């Protein structure tokens, strides 16, 4: 086991508050294995097991990178979204930090159509704005912002992820269910109120504390970055536009769906909705 992948200590985890679980009345009995004790009405997580689980999981994370498969970070609750987005960008991986849209993994055709719509709107706003009225521009800008907010982190995802990393699988149960349906392994930060059964790599910890989430997600991100550096793999931001070669390949796949219409006709139906 490559313990060098993780330089954290039990003390680091404790200082981040990773040991604080939920109130005893809100626990999931299946998390009993990872609980150290009950104190003042709260369950205290066994941080030795947290560290063990993290060190056990990191080589599997690195294996996904070595297999040239993408990783998807998921964390849409307030405490997680900024951490998830920053870590994914720094690692050159993908993320969902806003609303999880049903079918993001299991119905990629629909998601790709939404991304194509986003691309078309951007093109019209940047290249064809002179043909649009102020009202049309305002409506398109509003729609663009909504689509970008939800799709930004997976916009250039072209392959099925080799791993999904989740903060709070109870909160992200749809994402977990879609990953399991496709046979994608799931690594999750799991608190004492969650069911760890569907999770392949359980990291027991306080998943409501910003410090706890940041500490553990940063350790995972660092392992990804260091593995890529050792392999000589370029770290490219997931929100960066595709290269010309990648764009050409993508265009070839989607060419049959491209059809130049009058701008008014393009968006009449969508705006009516």
From Swiss-Prot:
GO cellular component terms, alphabetically, are: cytosolic small ribosomal subunit
Q: Where is this region: Disordered?
A: 244-273
A GO BP entry: translation
Q: Which Pfam families match?
A: Ribosomal_S2 (PF00318)
Q: Name one GO molecular function term.
A: structural constituent of ribosome
Arranged from A to Z, the UniProt key words for this protein are: Ribonucleoprotein, Ribosomal protein
Specify whether Ribosomal protein is a keyword of the entry: yes
Composition bias, kind Basic and acidic residues: at what positions?
Answer: 255-273
The portions of this protein that span the membrane are: none
Q: Report the sequence similarity comment from the record.
A: Belongs to the universal ribosomal protein uS2 family.
Q: What is this protein called?
A: Small ribosomal subunit protein uS2
């Amino acid at each position: 086991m490559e313990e060098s992948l993780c330089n954290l200590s039990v003390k680091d985890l404790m200082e981040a508050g990773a040991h604080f679980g939920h109130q005893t009345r809100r626990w999931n009995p299946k998390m009993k294995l990872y609980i150290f004790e009950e104190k003042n009405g709260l369950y205290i997580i066994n941080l030795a097991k947290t560290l063990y689980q993290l060190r056990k999981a990191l080589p599997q994370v690195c294996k996904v990178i070595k297999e040239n498969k993408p990783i998807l970070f998921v964390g849409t609750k307030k405490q997680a979204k900024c951490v998830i987005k920053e870590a994914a960008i720094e690692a050159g991986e993908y993320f969902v930090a806003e609303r999880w849209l049903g079918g993001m993994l299991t119905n990629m055709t629909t998601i790709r159509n939404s991304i194509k719509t986003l691309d078309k709107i951007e093109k019209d706003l940047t290249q064809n704005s002179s043909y649009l009225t102020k009202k049309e521009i305002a409506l398109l800008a509003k729609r663009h912002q909504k689509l970008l907010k939800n799709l930004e982190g997976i916009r250039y995802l072209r392959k099925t992820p080799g791993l999904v990393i989740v903060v709070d699988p109870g909160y992200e149960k749809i994402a977990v269910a879609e990953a399991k349906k496709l046979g994608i392994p799931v690594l999750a930060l799991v608190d004492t109120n969650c069911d760890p059964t569907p999770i392949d790599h359980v990291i027991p910890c306080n998943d409501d504390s910003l410090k706890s989430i940041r500490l553990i997600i940063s350790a995972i991100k660092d392992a990804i970055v260091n593995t890529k550096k050792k392999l000589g793999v370029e770290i490219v931001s997931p929100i960066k536009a595709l290269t010309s070669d990648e764009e050409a390949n993508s265009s070839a796949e989607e060419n049959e769906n491209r059809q130049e219409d009058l701008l008014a006709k393009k968006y009449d139906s969508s705006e009516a909705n």
